[in-house]
A protein has these predicted regions:
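Residue-level signal for inorganic ion chemistry
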Residues: 110, 131, 164, 273, ...
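Short glycine-/acidic-enriched loop or helix-start segments at secondary-structure transitions
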Residues: 62-63, 118-119, 139-140, 173-176, ...
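Buried hydrophobic packing segments
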Residues: 66, 70, 90-94, 274-284, ...
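Phosphate-binding loop of NTP-binding sites
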Residues: 2-204
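ATP-dependent carboxylate-amine ligase
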Residues: 1-15, 19, 24-26, 202, ...
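Adenine nucleotide phosphate-binding catalytic loops in nucleotide-utilizing enzymes
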Residues: 185-323
Length: 447
């Protein structure tokens, strides 16, 4: 082993040992190690079978559900559970890996779309999974085709890897890559072809650029699409969700390829994440019983429908970061059969996306149909989100606003509702979790 690699390992692991005692250390150890040896990740990852999960929405939950299943097979699975998904976080993940008791080293990693190509200079995945691509952080990623091309550039570096795609997205039709491709998607009862419910990305037919119609439209531009001009249609699915048995604000049950599964996480959008996890697990050889066992042990992860108690109140923290994701979160809380207070926390740091105009494309109008006695607008851009919420027609006198997340927490405590939902952008979610962790209301995790 080269001296620079040895020094990198020493610096990275020593810093992780110290920082982990403080509930920190998911990126700095990797950053220190890379300063000594820029190729250290290649050395650390060389003996692993690697599954990469990327895409706009659903990376963290898809990864967590997959890891839960694969632990039933392998016992030990390397992953980055706190969502540190750039090269420093991925390097830290490998730096701190424990030896597998089975002798088989498996890593399931969520990786940032813009970082993936650079990271693939050092790792060689056997499977890439793309959950979806929607408009997100335009100041960082650009428009959706730019993001998609970033991902395809990474995949082309590993032409032997299989690529698992969301077949319900027209964007993923016939990708320009040499890799073998498989598709997952919803294959429930179809109806007459209609325009999408809402298509904020403006996706057109990938062959002739005509407007697409849908025989089944799950949400946004996803579903069984067809072009009536040229006949282009969704590809055949390798992994099919054929029935939605139950859908609530905190759980769902569904049938995939003849087997019924359930997760203790609400919302239609999260069923796509479960479907992707089933597809990954089956590709890697897991049977339905092991998949069920993994799902039975699953829980909401790191700000993705994470629940906690404040006194006698049951609270749920939900990450939002773009129009489609926010709209789906709103659809999910709409399923709650009880009144609840709502807090919406909007920051505009680099990790959130500095441009917050996306809030005007999210369907906040639905809140006027819910039993929400009070709303709290918080975060750096509290006045912006408060204005957006007032525009829905929700009574302005029932909206409080503050930049202080500590004050938001105190307000939730004082409100009468026994249930609360907190929708938060990424850095607001991290800050709010820190407040909760300091009160020991949630488990402190590295961030």
């Amino acid at each position: 082993m080269k001296l620079k690699t040895t020094l990198g390992l020493l610096a990275g692991r020593s810093s992780h040992f110290i920082l982990s005692r403080l509930g920190r250390g998911s990126t700095l150890p990797g950053k220190l190690a890379l300063q000594f040896d820029k190729d250290i990740l290649q050395n650390l990852a060389k003996n692993y079978e690697i599954v990469v999960v990327t895409g706009t929405n659903g990376k963290t939950l898809t990864t967590a559900l997959t890891v839960g299943i694969l632990k039933e097979i392998n016992g030990q699975v390397l992953t980055n559970p706190s969502g540190a998904n750039m090269i420093t976080g991925i390097t830290t993940t490998f730096l701190t890996a424990k030896s597998s008791k089975t002798g088989k080293n498996i890593a399931v990693l969520e990786i940032d779309e813009a970082s993936l190509s650079h990271i693939c200079d050092y790792i060689h995945p056997s499977l890439f999974v793309i959950t979806n691509i929607f408009r997100d952080q335009m100041d960082r990623y650009g428009e959706i085709y730019t993001t998609y091309n970033m991902i395809l550039d990474a995949i082309r570096k590993v032409p032997t890897a299989t690529v698992l795609l969301n077949g319900d997205s027209p964007l993923f039709y016939k990708p320009a890559i040499p890799n073998p491709v498989q598709y997952f998607g919803f294959d429930m009862e179809k109806g007459p072809a209609q325009l999408a419910h809402y298509n904020t990305e403006g996706i057109l037919c990938p062959d002739c650029q005509s407007i697409l119609k849908y025989e089944l439209n799950t949400y946004a531009n996803l579903g069984a699409y067809i072009c009536e001009n040229c006949g282009c249609k969704r590809p055949d699915l390798d992994y099919r969700l054929t029935e939605l048995v139950e859908l609530t604000n905190n759980r769902s049950r569904f049938v995939i390829d003849g087997q019924e599964y359930g997760i203790q996480i609400g919302g239609l959008y999260n069923i796509y994440n479960a479907l992707a996890a089933v597809a990954i697990a089956r590709y890697l050889g897991a049977d339905s019983q092991l998949i069920k066992q993994g799902f039975d042990k699953s829980r909401a992860v790191f700000g993705r429908q994470e629940t906690f108690q404040i006194g006698d109140k049951e609270c749920t923290l939900v990450l939002i970061k773009n129009p489609v994701g926010a709209t789906q979160a709103i659809e999910m809380i709409k399923l709650a059969p009880y009144p609840f207070s709502l807090s919406v926390l909007l920051n505009a740091n680099y990790a959130d996306g500095i441009d917050t105009s996306w809030i005007w494309d999210a369907d906040f109008e639905q809140i006027t149909d819910m039993d929400i006695p009070e709303i709290n607008a918080g975060g750096v851009r509290h006045s912006e989100i408060a204005r957006r919420l007032r525009v829905t027609g929700y009574p302005a006198d029932k909206i409080t606003e503050t930049s202080s997340l500590e004050q938001v927490l105190k307000t939730i405590e004082a409100q009468d509702c026994k249930h609360a939902y907190i929708l938060a952008t990424y850095t607001a979610m991290l800050e709010f979790r820190d407040l909760l962790a300091n009160r020991q209301l949630v488990r402190k995790e590295m961030n």
